[in-house]
């Protein structure tokens, strides 16, 4: 098991020794030691500006870009290998998603595309958003176990 600072109520360890944190990441990440996590995988809120999916969740963040910059900065500090950061560019956050990609261009090893074969239809005559991005960040190059691995996942 990894050596962690004191993590009371929001830290759980399973039988494999893996640690799961159920808390606001900006409360937990500053408590972690540098390079104390092997891999990080997260999907921040999309900032869709509407609440039609979860009854107790408000998906409005007026400074979405800065929030994500702060989170990725902390993840780069604590993660040894790779960070997988799942984003969707939508009508409300599109400009900020592309600014975020530019901001971390030196840390991005690759961008994997998640192509959805049956996405939620767009309203009106708008183009349906059928993809999400996985930004892969880190300092260690990506490797594959085959000679032909694509960076597109289709579901």
Regions found by a protein language model. Name each.
Residues 1-155:
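Core catalytic lobe of class I
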